[in-house]
């Protein structure tokens, strides 16, 4: 596991975007060789998406031969609802780049058979050859996607009933009306993300500092699902200074010392492996 500590959340977005661009370009995707990218929603990756859009406009990266799989979607929310993850992804990223619509995969929370929808999603990932790079964010309780505390660490894509804390946190997006907040979601499982060749997790803000501490300094624990990625062969966590507030000083010094030995602009994928 590698932890990259940067000064601000803006720096995290820029660093992550540069890394994604480099991974895609180094892969040299083409008509018979697609780069498969797993993507999150939420406020944390917005900076990364904005930077990737700029790189695309500058001709530095193309998404023509990229296939994407999003982490999750609410159940029962219309696709054109402003809080649906379909709307989020098209509004904040996809409509600004050259990705083909048929190469975008987002779970359908309005499917007549939700279990079949989840199983189909897993099959689509397999048919695409597996995910090269899965990007995620975490919540203050260490959940990744909608794999909330207590989730199985070998779980697959499934229907998930959301915890009360999550419902209350999401109420701000629905006029603070709890009756409007979706009670269920479709989500990739921890095991689904673990199958990816590489995982990059973005963590920003002091409110996520304890979750980062649990992910880095303590053992694997299903009550902190992000901790499962200690056991992934190629995990990269990118955080800002605020997110390190619960880490030991020597832990911060250790990872900062490693980063100093790597030129950010020329960092290779192998440079981030254990």
Swiss-Prot record:
GO annotations of cellular component type: cytoplasm
Reactions mediated catalytically: alpha-D-glucosamine 6-phosphate + H2O = beta-D-fructose 6-phosphate + NH4(+)
Disulfide linkage: none
Enzyme class, broadest EC rank: hydrolase
SUPFAM superfamilies registered for this protein in UniProt: NagB/RpiA/CoA transferase-like
GO biological process: carbohydrate metabolic process; generation of precursor metabolites and energy; glucosamine catabolic process; N-acetylglucosamine catabolic process; N-acetylneuraminate catabolic process
Name of this protein: Glucosamine-6-phosphate deaminase
Source organism of this protein record: Drosophila pseudoobscura pseudoobscura
Taxonomy of the source species: Eukaryota, Metazoa, Ecdysozoa, Arthropoda, Hexapoda
Gene from which this protein is expressed: Gnpda
